[in-house]
């Protein structure tokens, strides 16, 4: 597979191409406020399987679902406790992951077979725009082979995952 290097920007063409890859079950690396994430449609088992394959990660290691807005969270989790609501109000969007009891909508492959799911809302314009346009939560661990350093640049992602993912 050829990996397409797209400039990490809010450019409509780049975002639309990334969304098309995601809708076709492919993987796309995208920037967040911390590191690059390796995104797949978090509700598509075949796409999620590709994350584990590309990273060489065991499938019993749960993934984080990234959302763009709170309406997405309500579909993924059974309840939002007062404590979780406090954290959401104070720290989202931002680099905080919160673990919730999941709904049946969340594939077991995403949760590593657990009855919980980890969710975060990134505070990065490109990440949020991509998730919003894709209109699905993105399962997105760091965009690197398991055991390697988490990438902070598109160049680092390309050096590690070129040929294993559709786009950066």
Task: Go through each PLM region and give its residues.
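Active-site-adjacent structural elements in enzyme catalytic cores
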Residues: 1-168
């Amino acid at each position: 597979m050829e990996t397409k290097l797209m400039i990490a920007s809010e450019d409509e063409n780049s975002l639309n191409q990334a969304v098309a890859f995601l809708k076709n079950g492919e993987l796309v690396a995208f920037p967040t406020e911390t590191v690059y994430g390796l995104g797949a449609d978090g509700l598509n088992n075949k796409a999620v399987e590709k994350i584990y394959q590309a990273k060489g990660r065991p499938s019993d290691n749960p993934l984080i679902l990234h959302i763009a807005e709170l309406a997405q969270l309500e579909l993924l989790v059974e309840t939002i406790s007062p404590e979780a609501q406090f954290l959401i109000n104070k720290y989202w969007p931002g680099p905080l992951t919160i673990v919730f009891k999941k709904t049946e909508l969340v594939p077991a492959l995403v949760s590593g077979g657990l009855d919980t799911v980890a969710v975060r809302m990134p505070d990065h314009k490109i990440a949020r725009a991509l998730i919003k346009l894709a209109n699905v939560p993105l399962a997105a661990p760091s965009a690197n082979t398991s055991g390697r350093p988490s990438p902070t640049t598109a160049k680092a992602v390309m050096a590690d995952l070129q040929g294993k993912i559709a786009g950066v």
